[in-house]
């Protein structure tokens, strides 16, 4: 888990360094938005999944599968959380 976090933080830093010549290019702005989205997901992924995700089959719903911090349970196909 720690290695995954380190890789993601490094990716966010690299995305933020890819600015255009003037620092305001469209590509730079897109990268900044993507980086902040990744960081927001990292921060929120540490809490419990939304209540509706507990009853869904996580393989069928990509929105819920990102909340499965311990992966999908192979028997019930529901979210396992740490």
UniProtKB/Swiss-Prot annotation:
Residues annotated with 4-hydroxyproline modification: 49-50
Sequence positions bearing 4-carboxyglutamate: 60, 63
Signal peptide as annotated in the record: 1-23
InterPro entries: Toxin_Pg
A GO cellular component annotation in the UniProt record: extracellular region
Tissue: Expressed by the venom duct.
Cellular localization per UniProt: Secreted
Prosequence residues removed at maturation: 24-46
GO MF term set: toxin activity
Record remark on domains: The cysteine framework is IX (C-C-C-C-C-C).
Protein name: Turripeptide Gsp9.1
């Amino acid at each position: 888990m720690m290695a995954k976090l380190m890789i993601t933080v490094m990716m966010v830093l690299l995305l933020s360094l890819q600015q255009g010549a003037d620092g305001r290019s469209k590509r730079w702005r897109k990268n900044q938005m993507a980086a902040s989205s990744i960081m927001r997901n990292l921060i929120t992924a540490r809490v419990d999944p939304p209540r509706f995700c507990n009853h869904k089959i996580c393989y069928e719903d990509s929105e819920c599968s990102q909340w499965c911090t311990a992966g999908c349970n192979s028997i019930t196909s529901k979210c396992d959380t740490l």
